[in-house]
Amino acid sequence: MSEVKASLKGARLSAQKARLVVDQIRGKSVSEALNILTFSPKKAAVIVKKVLESAIANAEHNEGADVDDLRVSTAYVDEAMTLKRIMPRAKGRADRILKRGCHITVKVAD
């Protein structure tokens, strides 16, 4: 079986914060990765877990893979478009607020 991919585009989460979670599961078995994500207190863990579960479902449904043999072969986070917003400040000034997004990609293989 080749690699099976699942990705989430435009997640409303900074790439820096998502990478902290993704780095923990790269190269691990699928069951171990799900365990790590389940007990992680970070917001990114919930999002990455959904992407990983999607990759597992894709492998099982499309390739007929055995879930017990799957490993997280590749996992990476790319920056998405940043939304620029304005926060009014004193004396007519304004500060810029950057609402960052990211693209999360997880590939599983046996």
From Swiss-Prot:
Keyword Ribonucleoprotein belongs to the record: yes
Family annotation (PROSITE patterns): RIBOSOMAL_L22
SUPFAM superfamilies in the cross-refs: Ribosomal protein L22
Signal peptide as annotated in the record: none
UniProt GO cellular component terms: cytosolic large ribosomal subunit
One Pfam family cited in the UniProt record for this chain: Ribosomal_L22
Keyword annotations: Ribonucleoprotein, Ribosomal protein, RNA-binding, rRNA-binding
GO molecular function, one term: rRNA binding
Gene3D superfamilies: Ribosomal protein L22/L17
InterPro entries referenced in this protein's UniProt entry, alphabetically: Ribosomal_uL22, Ribosomal_uL22_bac/chlpt-type, Ribosomal_uL22_bac/org-type, Ribosomal_uL22_CS, Ribosomal_uL22_sf
GO terms of biological process kind: translation
Homology family: Belongs to the universal ribosomal protein uL22 family.
Cited NCBIfam families: rplV_bact
Purpose: This protein binds specifically to 23S rRNA; its binding is stimulated by other ribosomal proteins, e.g. L4, L17, and L20. It is important during the early stages of 50S assembly. It makes multiple contacts with different domains of the 23S rRNA in the assembled 50S subunit and ribosome.
Assembly and binders: Part of the 50S ribosomal subunit.
Protein name: Large ribosomal subunit protein uL22
Source organism (scientific name): Marinomonas sp. (strain MWYL1)
